């Protein structure tokens, strides 16, 4: 216990002492072409609330609250960045249930919870922005951390790859990605669903400390949704929010609206970001 307290104290000391280095990625989900500076760990955490989520694989529907929505990005070279994403805990207030391939074991009378799936990513900057847009390539995989018996996950490993374009038009930053996602079909043997990944986002700084932003991002399946494909259905979100710099942190909030029938009707997210220098010297 004493060792845990000491380690926590060291982490907090580094967190509050480290100078900010233009930390901004939340609350958007569309990846940009920027690479975090070498030796910098960008730590982002948040809270999500989504209304009327549907889970065809388990037949559950309800309001989802996500605690500890983590995104950690680290620059390991001038053109290379690694990233870890995931959620510490998801809680679903169950408002409805229909027959489905997986019969969930609820953890409460009308609720269920479990750790979220985590993903690992690598991003490579292929071309810096000049007159032509910046170009980056991003690939990664999703790990099956969530137990499908809880009704919130697929217990499947998915692979993703996408190409990112980014261009500044005056003060406006525009970027987007397009690629492919190879998703395991959890309800069918030896089957997968190849889907289109997409995203488009705009960021505009109102002042040196306040920026507004919006996006539409998700994945699209051209196949008809059958029980064999439950868990690989199309998913997408639109987000509109702002980021405020203060006290060495980046504070963000955004409204959320779903794109497809199984997506949340409405929701919001709130979070904070901070850059920590782990190694290397800060440029004067």
Describe the residue ranges of each PLM region:
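Sec-dependent signal peptide recognition
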Residues: 2-9
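Cleavable N-terminal signal peptides
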Residues: 9-11, 21
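Transmembrane beta-barrel domains of Gram-negative outer membranes and organellar outer membranes
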Residues: 22-284
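Alpha-helical and His/Cys-centered functional microenvironments
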Residues: 11-12, 28
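Serine/threonine-rich low-complexity intrinsically disordered regions
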Residues: 1-2, 275
